[in-house]
Every structure is written in structure tokens, then in C-alpha cells.
Amino acid sequence: MSCNLLVILGPTASGKTQLGVELARRLSGEIISADSRQVYRGMDIGTGKDLAEYGDIPYHIIDIVDPGFEFNVFEFQRCFQRAFAHIVNRGRLPVMVGGTGMYLEAVLNRYRFVEVPENADLRRELSTFSDEELAERLKGANPRLHNTTDLLERGRLVRAIEIAEYEDSREPLPLPELAPLIFGIRWERPVLRQRITDRLKARLEQGMIDEIEQLHRSGIPYETLEFYGLEYRFVAKYLKGELNRNDMFQKLNSAIHDFAKRQDNWFRRMERHGTVIHWLEGDGDPLKEAQEILRLNAIPR
């Protein structure tokens, strides 16, 4: 099966969008965003939408819900399936770009998310099981299990069993067959840290504080805004008078650096569990590197 999905992943400020747009332009592609915050309308500077970068390239799963809507990985997977089918049916190539690891894994590992209620009786029964017994129960309930992430943590094991046994008598929704080619952008740590700091300064100069203040004036409490990511959390604290501007910048900058490390850790974990990522050097020519890998995979450039 030839590649039917291109994926560009990497930590924040790594240049994913730019590369994704360049490849989409060359491959008759369209962007599918895998960013948990860019779905929200009105949250532009703080989420780094950079819509001007897209130019004439169509994009999906950006600006689709209002702040306050609880958008989660279940919603993302449904949106991805619709966008993927829409793009493929018109003979174009989906290019998924993002750094939200859970969203990326949901697609690449073909997680089957359904709205399954908690089963109190089943949970009481499973509470007497060892982790090994839970793992065997899950394998019995889902013999086609290929992704083993759910076997690594007890709470996820229980929930996975709950879902598998709930689904057993139901007709599953079809998931698209994927043949992804995955690129990741990486930088030396000091260089990425400087890119993060420079980008934060630029966003503040572009009016990020005003954007967040306007969201508050539109009726969104500061306490709610704090749940929409680091930028919104620390700027909300500044606007409430809990931090001065310098402390806000320093704490936010440090928090974004830590977030980038967590993203890198997530991507490494994906690799340990079998995801093949072709890493491109950010300080080299990632577009040229990507085109060479595309050539080797016999994908027209």
C-alpha cells in the first residue's frame, strides 16, 4: 500500500507548519492540524496558528469550535476521519501537522474511541485482578490488539477492557486504512530554547496579551482561560495581577521549554513502541531531506 498520509511532528517552535505547507504545496496536499488548541476560534496568537503561512493551502481542524467547548481526542479522531476522507476522495494527499502526541497516536495507532459509560460492576470485579491478569483479560477481549500502550498502566488497562467488552456486541465504525510516512523535526536543545524564547517575544509584541484580555471581555473567566495552555495560563495570571510582566515572561518561557522536553519524550516513546519517524535536522535543509526520503519511498515530489 503506497503512502496515503504524510505526518510532520516535532516540539513547539520547531518549524512544523512551514515544512508541512511546503510539502503540501509540492504534493497536492492539504493540511490536517493535530494541535489540541488550534481548534478554538479567537485563540490565534496564543496558539500559534500562523494562518498566513498556509497561503492557498487548504487546512482542516483549525477554528472549528468556540472556547468553552470540550474538544478531546475522541472529537479529534472523528474530525480527522472526516477530513481524511474529504481530502483523499478528491485525489489529494493529507498532510497531518502537529505536536499533540495523544492526537498523533490516536490516528497512527488507529485507536477506536467510543463513548462508553463506566461500568461500576465490571470495575469492582477487575479491582481484584493483578496487572498480569488484566493484561490477559484485555488480550482476550481484543485479540487483534497491536498497540500495547494500554498494557503499561493499570487505569488504562481497566478502561481498555471496559471499552473492548462494551464494543464486543456492537458493529465497529470503520477506520481508514493508513500507510503513513512520518517526518520529525529536531534541533539541538540550546537552539530550540532560543527559538522558543524568540517566538514568545514576537507573540507578545504581536498582541497576545490583548488577545487574551479580549477573550476575557467576551465572557470567558480567567480561571477557564488557564486551561487552554501555558500562554493563556500565565498571561491570565498577569492580567489578574498575580504576576508582574517580567515574572510572567520568565515563568512562561521556562514552562514552554519544559513542555518542549515533554513533547520530545513523547515522540521517543512512540519510537520505542514501533512508530518509525524519519528525523530531519532543523538547522539543515529539512525540506531537501524530506524530498529525498520521499524519492526513496517512490512518492512523486
From Swiss-Prot:
PANTHER family per UniProt: TRNA DIMETHYLALLYLTRANSFERASE
Residues noted as binding ATP in the record, renumbered to the chain: 10-17
Gene Ontology biological process terms from the UniProt entry: tRNA modification
GO terms assigned for molecular function: ATP binding; tRNA dimethylallyltransferase activity
Cofactor requirements of the protein: Mg(2+)
Site (Interaction with substrate tRNA): 100
Name the record gives this protein: tRNA dimethylallyltransferase 1
SUPFAM superfamilies: P-loop containing nucleoside triphosphate hydrolases
Name of encoding gene: miaA1
Cross-referenced InterPro entries: Dimethylallyltransferase, IPT, P-loop_NTPase
Annotated source species: Geotalea uraniireducens (strain Rf4) (Geobacter uraniireducens)
Cysteines paired by S-S bonds: none
Coiled-coil ranges (or none): none
